[in-house]
């Protein structure tokens, strides 16, 4: 009986946590640069100059600064 009660309590706690609680542990970095023709460039500059030491990747044309 105690085991069933503990299992029910565990399920209730996990249900209260919900799926969104995992998102709190994932940090989303702002995208301050973008990949244009394979070159990482800053979004805010008018001339879109290249960023020194930027880490670009081609997944949905996103990139982020190191």
Swiss-Prot record:
Signal peptide as annotated in the record: 1-24
GO cellular component terms attached to this protein's record: extracellular region
Subcellular location: Secreted
Expression across tissues: Produced by the crural gland and detected in venom from the spur located on each male hind leg. Is also widely expressed in both male and female tissues, including intestine, kidney, spleen and testis.
A single GO molecular function term of this UniProt record: toxin activity
Predominant localisation class: secreted
Keywords on record: Disulfide bond, Secreted, Signal, Toxin
A Pfam family annotated for this UniProt entry: Defensin_3
Family matches, as SUPFAM superfamilies: Defensin-like (SSF57392)
Chain's role: Does not show antimicrobial, myotoxic, hemolytic and cell-promoting activities.
Name of the protein: Defensin-like peptide 1
Species this protein is from: Ornithorhynchus anatinus (Duckbill platypus)
């Amino acid at each position: 009986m105690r085991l069933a009660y503990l299992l029910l309590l565990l399920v209730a706690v996990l249900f209260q946590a919900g799926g969104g609680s995992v998102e709190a542990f994932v940090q989303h970095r702002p995208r301050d640069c973008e990949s244009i023709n394979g070159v990482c460039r800053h979004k805010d500059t008018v001339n879109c100059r290249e960023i020194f030491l930027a880490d670009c990747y081609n997944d949905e044309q996103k990139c982020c600064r190191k």
